Amino acid sequence: MSTIDLPTSSLPGSSGDPSGTEMSHSDVDVSVDIDVIFPDHTQTLSFSLLLSNTIHDVRQVILELMLAPPHTCFHLEYKREKLHSFLEIGQIPHLKLSKTRKIVLEVVLDPYTERESKYHIYTLLEFLSRKLPSSSTSPGIRAGFCIFPSLNIPSGENLQIKSSSSLEEINKIPENIVTQSLSYTNLLKKFETSPNPSNNGCFRSLALSGWNPVPAEFVIQGHLLYLTVLTIEGKTYNITSHVSGFYVNNCTSTKFDPSPCDDLQSHSLVLLLEQLSPLFKERLHLSLNDYKSGDAIAQASITGTLPQAPWITFPVPHRADLSRTQKSELFPYIENQGNLRDWNEEIQSTREMDHEDVQDRVLRERLTVKTLQDFTDMAVEGAIDMVNGNIPSLNPLEPTASQMFVHNNIFFSYGRDSVGIFSTKGGDSAAYSAVGKDILAIRLLNQFDLSNPSLLGTCVVDYAGHRVVAQTIVPGIFKQLENGSSHLIYGKVEGESDFRFDESFEGELSRISDLLHIKKHFFVDGKEKSFPLYTSMDAKALKGSDGRTYLMDLYSLFPLDAQFLEVISDEKNEEFPAYPHKLVHVRPELVQLFYEMKLQAFVNANHNAPKKKNLNDSLKSVELEGNGIKLSSEKGKNNVNKVRNDNARFDCGFNPDCFRSDYIFPPDNKELYDKDIENSYALSQYLHAEVIPNFVKSLSEPSSFLPIDGVALCRAMHRSGINIRYLGEIANIILQKSPNNVILLKLVTSEIFIRSIKHVFRNFLAVVPQVLRSHLLSHLLNNLFTVYGYVEPTKPLINENIANLFFQATQVIYSINSTSLYSSIKKEASSRFRFNLTDDLLHSLNPICILRGTCLRLGIQISCKDYFSNKSDDKICEEHAVPNGSTKFTGKKGNKKKRNLGKSQNTTNRQVESEQINIFRPKDILNLMPVIKTCIPYSGLAQESLEACKACLLQGNKELCYNLLNESLSLHEQIYGVLHTEVARAYCQLAMIYHQLEKKEEAVELARKAVIVCERFLGFDSSETSLAYMNLSLYEFSQKNEMQAVMHMQHALKLWYLVFGPDHPNTINSFTNLSLMLHGSEKFIQSQKCLQIAVDLSDKIFGKTTPTASLYLQLAQLMVLNKDSRSALHAVRVAYDILKETLGPDHQNTKEAEHWLSEFTALAVNQERQSRT
């Protein structure tokens, strides 16, 4: 029996008396077994649901279990009485449960409508396309790529089948990790899972026929659609979709005759195709069995959120498929198409939904996430079309930067200073930064349960050098109001000195200012009128025609960094170029951290609290990770309010308009303004004197976890309230205080280098058309890596006709050389990060890491090759190559063709010569993807349940913790769905808690899910994916699954080596763990080799320290097991000398090492004597 627990069924509830026959309130969350009987020979389905689930849920389970369901158009009956879709199971008429709690439902087939017919066809095509790498709607190649199922790691039933190959792999450890030949090509080639559609498909073609649409005279006879199918056997059939089902008709490619042919008909298209094609039936069942035997999450279709596409990959084989071109026609959910949806109304309606009880909150948050994600998907699609010139502008006579677009009910504009708002603050650079800060503030405010004011759905898309802002449309914004009135009710009037303030809006503004710690301050406008401000001067509120108030332009809600502003405003500073803009606001996490520190000091001073007491129980700091923001809990807010009520003297609000030349305060507020300036300086001092130095110190400690790449480093900086612009300050602190910490310095300078590259490449991309992007990027990359000793690249060979069409863009590409490129990159680094990138520093960086970081930041997908080795991977690429789609111009026939022959030969020779010299070729640039910033909030309810679970674990209440753990898991899956980045992170945390609760099997199962979802949504080589593999390895090891543990740890270390290099300090612990796992598998030689690597790394990175001595002692014991007593004696002597020097001769650890030294000395002497005799 298949047991399915839907997400909605996992909320806690009480169970009633299982023997009762009448339903009571306490029975609604009781689980019941359901048998579903079909009208044909389809096997009966059995599964379990709660009585609180609906008949619609039952229907969905049926469709999901069937995978490629033969029946999709049906209703359910109980004792021959039709059941409504939204009827709860427990409310079925005349339902009486026996002691076995089993319900038998019958499937009754319904007549088709055009929508139901399309759904039936769409479901079949969707299932058959699941394994195709191009099936995702993402703009990236192989989006959602997953390695885990292809690792062939033995588990469960296939343990014996795969154990021999796994043992052979284990015997190569650690050589296959630390080898020089380790590369992305070697890593990915055996995971290449591109099925050849012509071999694995169930038919050659299934598409809408050319006889569509159905003529009116046949519509009235019940005809819905006409289909054409080409079977694998090579036969072509024309099929009529009728209200009664599907049948083969007498149509041909030239004759229209939709009458039935023979007796080939069925209510199900699947069953009809099985009659027509034996190979279809055979391959469909093979596909079903293959899907059922594989991992469901790895194979599941991705809906609701954009998956991560790998930055390095193989091209996807392409084939003709009419159904792909007709996907929009076959899509059954017409109401979900972007051009028919009022995005603003949907988003605001979900925000205004009730959220008093748990079920209401679940529904509200689920719809909020779903609606904003649908909006984001449509915004990304529109932004790409906009940049590529496929959407007409509303104001085509304006310059490109000022043009506006409306597409699919979404407003698009460029993130540039089109009207001069930022002319005194940095122009386009300021506008670019302001857009990022604006969406950060919107996402932050979306976390609060505020129905007012309304916030626009917003998405920022960086694509091909352009920053595009996509927003929902304020109702009535394009309409002129009567009597010359304005939509503006709060904020400055554009182009004027007036300020408008509607007092009815003051309450909502006050609430927001309290949440964000913004101080109420006053502003004098051009008419010398004083107005209270609860936000920055730039923020505005508009009144829409729907009666809602919309708050926007939130890019300057947080204070400016006073110290940094002084530094960049110093015109006499000749050390660094001018900073690009003056919007140097601090992050909200820093404001929250400073607020908590001040509140702690206030509590200690006024309530006689211990000075070291922290406020984690009452306040939780703001944390922004990816798309998730973690804010103060409701309990924390209540505690803050309580403190404020106890003593109103506590004041730690900030004036975000300090240091602005256009901010004029009332004369009688001079003292208050001076206090605001003082607070801003205190915040800035706190950042530069405490937060940043402590952050560097925390990363420098041997026991700390150093981020694996720049993405992880930046997330750690944001959690600490540190802006990315302080990377240079962090690097300078390392050079001053920890010059020997080469690893940390390399990590920070790599990120400075990559981000500087991003800005330079972005400027070039913005002026180059789509057809020349691959030439530009390949040429830029070739010039970029000349710093590592590669020769100066030749100019790319651009088709003459294309070069003439885009003459200026071609000249821009030809003008690039390594000298000018590096000059621009170093200038960007000096300007943006106040740090000088020297040639010595650049030479020390890993080129693969730089290439990976550049591709991730710009959205570049490149062909999988070993670019920095002497080995040629042309053969590998040719196996997966797609024919070059560039147009070939051959010229006219006759003599001109003969004259061009020599020219063509010469061109070919120059092209071959160019490809031999250059590392990157235009065909190596496979794709350019958008980089997206969204305003989608994280689920407060799911996070609260997770925090409650952690709290129970700390208190030792394991039973309650286990219950809360299941609830948190259910809430995450209900709100986000299984396939989501936040669910991936939740899986990782929940697996760890399961492990701590000694629920080891559950921990392993959840950790496997975490690995798969991390790979599909965070990237197959992301830092979080690597850590997920390492955690899974440890959980497997605790389950005595040594072989699986070793294989997972090996894969994680390979990723670590590729992403960072061989000298990351945390690999010491990983190799130590791998050694223990190999020891448990009785692979003592391999175990010793891994521990030797850990010892060498520790010696190289940390020197002769206590941790290194501990590793030497472990190594000595392994050497003894391998009967290498001489080497063991040397290792233990090194450990003893280190401990004696660092801890002293009288320390317990030193004495223990001395004991082992004497033991190993005696052992070595005995073995020497035995060898002589």
Curated annotation (Swiss-Prot):
GO biological process, one term: mitochondrion organization
Task performed by this protein: mRNA-binding protein involved in proper cytoplasmic distribution of mitochondria.
Extent of Low complexity compositional bias: 1-21
Compartments, record wording: Cytoplasm
Annotated ranges, domain Clu: 316-565
TPR repeats: 984-1017
Membership in a protein family: Belongs to the CLU family.
Residue ranges, compositional bias (Basic residues): 890-901
Gene3D superfamilies associated with the record: Tetratricopeptide repeat domain (1.25.40.10)
A GO-annotated cellular component: cytoplasm
Protein keywords: Cytoplasm, Repeat, TPR repeat
Domain of life: Eukaryota
Region (Disordered): 1-25, 888-910
GO molecular function: mRNA binding
InterPro entries xrefs: CLU-central, CLU_dom, CLU_N, CLU_prot, GSKIP_dom_sf, TPR-like_helical_dom_sf, TPR_rpt
Protein name: Clustered mitochondria protein homolog
Oligomeric and partner information: May associate with the eukaryotic translation initiation factor 3 (eIF-3) complex.
